[in-house]
Amino acid sequence: SMITEQRRQAYIESMNAHDLEISEKWMPYGYYVAAAAKDHVANLLSLGASAIVCGNDLLASGAIDECRAHGYRVPEDVSIIGFDDIPISAQLNPPLTTVRQDRIELGKCGFFALHSLINHVSVSKNLLRPQLIIRNSTAPVRK
């Protein structure tokens, strides 16, 4: 999707800005469902990943399960972060650190964009500012 590609590009730009290695092996792609974590988490762990950033909270919940299945503790061994802050995120074990989007504002932007398109008015870009919700699935970087 366009959003996935934008997130990927932001990741690459951030890695470049900090002179860090960029490799496809660190950027697996899968469906945005918990079961998709099975396809990638074991490989990331075998590469020595100490943190996994997931495209949404469902994928992050699956990543937590997969880490446990492979004997890793979250967050002691691996930090996991999601995106969306769906209601179940705070109830996971451990509660999931995530990025919250303002759903009301997102809905308003969608409405105004659709209204503009219906009325043949060009649609402008809106950048919504997400909020990092720190819970217990992340820990400080290990040295």
Feature annotation, model-predicted:
Residues S1-K143:
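Bacterial carbohydrate/catabolite-sensing allosteric modules
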